[in-house]
């Protein structure tokens, strides 16, 4: 359970964080390149500058997380834009 954790600038490259509770966490400038985030809860997470390129996370909960301020693949950006639109 990493709910509310301060993960600023941390590296989670290739980490398996499936079903992880990351809600309310501070992920600013963290690196999640090719991490597995499917079915994770990232509700309300701060993602300014977070590197999400190559992740698996389409089926995670992104509600109230500012995913649009993160670096990510275009395919993920398109999928998230449909399900979790920017307010």
Locations of regions flagged by a protein language model:
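Tandem repeat scaffolds
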Residues: 1-87
């Amino acid at each position: 359970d990493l709910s509310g954790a301060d993960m600023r600038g941390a590296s989670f490259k290739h980490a398996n964080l499936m079903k992880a509770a990351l809600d309310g966490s501070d992920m600013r400038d963290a690196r999640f390149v090719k991490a597995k985030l499917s079915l994770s809860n990232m509700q309300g997470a701060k993602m300014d500058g977070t590197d999400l390129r190559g992740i698996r996370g389409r089926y995670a909960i992104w509600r109230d997380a500012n995913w649009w301020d993160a670096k990510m693949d275009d395919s993920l950006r398109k999928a998230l834009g449909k399900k979790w639109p920017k307010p």
